[in-house]
Amino acid sequence: MKTAVLLVCLAYVMAAILSLCASAPSWRPQGRFGKRTIPDRLPQTEESSLPDFGFSHLPALPLELFYNPRDLVHSGFRPRLCSVSGVEGYPPCVESHSDRKMKNLLDDLFGL
């Protein structure tokens, strides 16, 4: 009698394990991930008709993209943007003496 009860219990345990393993997962994603907007919903402007090369269409870039605002407040650091290639509307970047010295060392090292 003991073996019969043991076999029945074992059969129930095996049935429970197999039913859990063989069933489909209960979690299903809700909605579509990465939904795209319908082009007709957005107004067609000159900017949106241009190809998107990953550049910002904003006239100014937010400071928060580059710096943590909390760190800026505590350090007192106020970044100034400048242009190395001479972009109009930005002051030219001025190299410091140590920057020129480092550039010369790197040029000598790499033979540039």
Swiss-Prot record:
Post-translation changes: The prohormone is proteolytically cleaved in 2 steps, yielding first 2 products: luqin and PRMP. In the second step, PRMP is cleaved to yield luqin-B and luqin-C.
Modified sites of kind Phenylalanine amide: F33
What subcellular locations does the record give?
A: Secreted
Identify the stretch annotated as signal peptide in this record.
1-23
Record's GO cellular component terms: extracellular region
Q: Name one GO biological process term.
A: neuropeptide signaling pathway
The UniProt keyword set, sorted, is: Amidation, Cleavage on pair of basic residues, Neuropeptide, Secreted, Signal
Tissue-level expression reads: Neurons L2-4 and L6, also called giant dorsal LUQ (Left Upper Quadrant) neurons of the abdominal ganglion. Also expressed in smaller neurons in the CNS and in peripheral organs such as the kidney.
| Name listed for the protein in its UniProt record | Abdominal ganglion neuropeptides L5-67
Q: Organism source for this protein?
A: Aplysia californica
